[in-house]
């Protein structure tokens, strides 16, 4: 019973942060699973694929809850969200099957490199105007952005989401902020919708392959549903600049840890 309660609390925390920044929360869950819950450190998971599949299920729960919250707030730019979401589907499906080919050390190294890169980009850009653009100064009806580039990036977001179990928002939000010029609150809400759609395909493929451990997945997912509602409310009232800076540092440090773990596992040190 205590273990189930711990899963629920973990889900609430992950869901709150994930919806607040439009990142899904998988980037928090995967390191926790890998460091404490997979053999030889724990007994919940036995393979990396189970870590990814279970994490992605929690991301799905977080994203669907956050999507409904942001729809009520009218923060989702649907003319971007729908094509971006559709573009993630083939990438997510492909990633779900290619995840079978990732070994433990190789997975850790690739995941770490991705985390370090994203952490650096988020920190270097967080002090600029793009990260602090006001919704009031941006008209969604007339705003122009590079749709083909957004669609192309979204395909790779879906692929990364399913491969790494991180939801893809950790790539999508910076892209919408710093490449397409969306205000932070619009980028977060739109990313949450895209995560929901891409996670459907990713979760489906992982479920068919038996990669989801349903006990922890359901409890963490339930917590993520609750946390996403809290995160969406906080996002509506707050400026995410400080959170983005702190989060970028955390992502960078976790990435370094996974790079070291992967390199040691591959016999480089």
Go through the PLM ranges and name each one.
Residues 22-32, 165-175:
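Transmembrane helix boundary and interhelical junction motifs in multipass membrane proteins
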Residues 175-188, 193:
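Transmembrane helical segments that form the transport core of multi-pass membrane transport proteins
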Residues 195-201:
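Transmembrane helix-bundle signature of multi-pass secondary active exporters and lipid flippases
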């Amino acid at each position: 019973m205590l273990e189930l309660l711990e899963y629920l609390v973990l889900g609430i925390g992950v869901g709150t942060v994930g919806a607040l920044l439009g990142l899904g929360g998988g980037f928090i869950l995967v390191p926790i699973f890998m460091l404490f819950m997979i053999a030889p450190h724990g007994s919940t998971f036995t393979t990396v694929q189970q870590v990814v599949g279970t994490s992605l299920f929690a991301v799905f729960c977080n994203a669907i809850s956050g999507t409904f919250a942001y729809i009520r707030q009218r923060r989702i730019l649907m003319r971007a969200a729908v094509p971006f979401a559709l573009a993630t589907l083939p990438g997510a499906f492909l990633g779900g099957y290619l995840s079978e080919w990732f070994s433990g050390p190789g997975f850790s190294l690739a995941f770490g490199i991705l985390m370090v890169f994203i952490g650096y980009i988020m920190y270097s850009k967080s002090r600029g105007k793009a990260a602090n653009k006001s919704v009031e100064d941006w008209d969604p009806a007339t705003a122009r952005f590079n749709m083909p580039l957004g669609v192309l990036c979204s395909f790779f977001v879906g692929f990364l989401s399913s491969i790494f179990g991180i939801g893809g928002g950790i790539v999508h939000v910076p892209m919408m902020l710093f490449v397409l010029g969306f205000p932070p609150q619009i980028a977060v809400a739109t990313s949450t919708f895209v995560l929901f759609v891409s996670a459907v395909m990713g979760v489906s493929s992982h479920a068919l392959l038996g990669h989801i451990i349903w006990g922890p997945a359901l409890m963490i997912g339930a917590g993520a549903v609750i946390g996403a509602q809290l995160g969406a409310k906080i996002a509506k009232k707050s400026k995410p600049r400080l959170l983005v800076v702190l989060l970028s540092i955390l992502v960078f440090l976790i990435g370094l840890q996974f790079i070291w773990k992967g390199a040691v596992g591959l016999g480089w040190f």
